[in-house]
Amino acid sequence: MTTLTAQQIACVYAWLAQLFSRELDDEQLTQIASAQMAEWFSLMKSEPPLTAAVNELENRIAALTVRDDARLELAADFCGLFLMTDKQAALPYASAYKQDEQEIKRLLVEAGMVTSGNFNEPADHLAIYLELLSHLHFSLGEGSVPARRIDSLRQKTLTALWEWLPEFAARCRQYDSFGFYAALSQLLLVLVECDHQNR
């Protein structure tokens, strides 16, 4: 990626982690349709590989603003996709895709991080991967840890995530009939792919 800074990429990962970790509340729903968010989306679209995915997400957000009982419907979508059985869902856990759920724990230890007791999900939840990537991108800008070490850990994290993220995103597209989380997962997929190629 050439246009976005490490800190901006960190913010995108943190934002996506938040959206995939819990249902949106009224404040978040208002925020994603705000002028401030539109500016942020414009910035993301300055990165050509992200343009189509951001456009689709903006379309879903526009549809969301006219959806009856938007918050409740989106909460139902979240629950159906991420909290139910895996038959018609996109469970946000590495272990649901036959991946090593211990890998993220090793990566967190290597980064000197632990999961929060406030987040009542297994450590292999998608949001944990995204928080780790956010932390690593922020660390790149701080200069307190050698960049090579951070970059090595970033690449390991991206590789571990990429092993199951495409299937997760495909399941989001398949089972999210409204399309908000499908669009969100597509944006994440493109972001991770670009980040992974930016060695």
Swiss-Prot record:
It comes from the Bacteria. GO terms for biological process: protein complex oligomerization; protein folding. One of its GO terms (cellular component) is cytoplasm. The keyword Chaperone applies. Its main location: cytoplasm. It is found in: Cytoplasm. Keywords: Chaperone, Cytoplasm. InterPro entries: Chaperone_TorD, DMSO/NO3_reduct_chaperone, HscB_C_sf, TorD-like_sf, TorD/DmsD_chaperones. Gene3D superfamilies: 1.20.120.1820, HscB, C-terminal domain. Belongs to the TorD/DmsD family. TorD subfamily. Involved in the biogenesis of TorA. Acts on TorA before the insertion of the molybdenum cofactor and, as a result, probably favors a conformation of the apoenzyme that is competent for acquiring the cofactor. This is Chaperone protein TorD. It comes from Escherichia coli O7:K1 (strain IAI39 / ExPEC).
